[in-house]
Amino acid sequence: MEKMKATRNNMKYSVVMSVYAKDNPEWLKQAIDSLLNQTIQPDEIVIVEDGPLTLQLNVVMSQYKNSGIISIVRLKRNQGLGNALNIGIKYAKNELIGRMDSDDIAIPNRFQLQLAEFEKHSDLDILGGQIAEFVDDPEEIIGYRKVPVTHFEIKQFARRRSPFNHPTVMYKKSMIQQIGGYDASIIRLEDYDLWLRAIAKGAVCANLDDVILKYRSTTDAVKRRKTFISLRNHIRARIQFYKKGYISLSDLTYGLATQIILFMIPTKLAKFAFKKAVRE
């Protein structure tokens, strides 16, 4: 108990979340409530409204106007996740920033676990964790997305796949800004690009072995991966990674072949293949 109090007093943190017009109002409320119900509550929650919201989303947002810790940044037009997160990071007042998506649910002690790790390892720059997937009912878990735990394992894993579950990460603001933040031109893989650049610059990385977030799995997410635009974005991004020296030619070939196969096979089979890949 004493250790928890020390962490609460000495390590304040912000949470950055982006919301846009196509988000589900009920899911957004669940996401925000999961932040407010943390065993160690954030010092502030920065929510970037990425363009005008629907009436229903505005109703949800209005419920938290007197929370005392939620700061809202409104963008006149939709700028995409990368830009929205960069703006949120800029507005965040604390060095430690937790990421959160507008449709997921943070485990109650998520940030208590992450803060304890940052307190234990002062050189740590990026810390993620494991996620449990659900469809409709957060209590009915359909699977887990496992990522490597140690810095060495993360570096090896990152050559072919993103080594972090993006909505679970907590990172140092100074480090993220030092490497230029998210590259908004890397559509869909802006987080993967960020991790590769951070690792290349010597960032110290780790993942907790604990499940710290419940991730909402939808068929729409798989369908978006199977569009020609998504395939084109993945190909462009991976070629850039190769040109910058982040991945080898064999890593590039593996990544391109995987994306092309997922694009060509039926959606149900693609969903099965994707889930099998991220859970192994």
Task: State where each predicted segment sits.
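Non-catalytic, C-terminal membrane-associated alpha-helical segments of glycosyltransferases
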Residues: 220-280
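Nucleotide-sugar donor-binding/catalytic module of glycosyltransferases
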Residues: 2-227
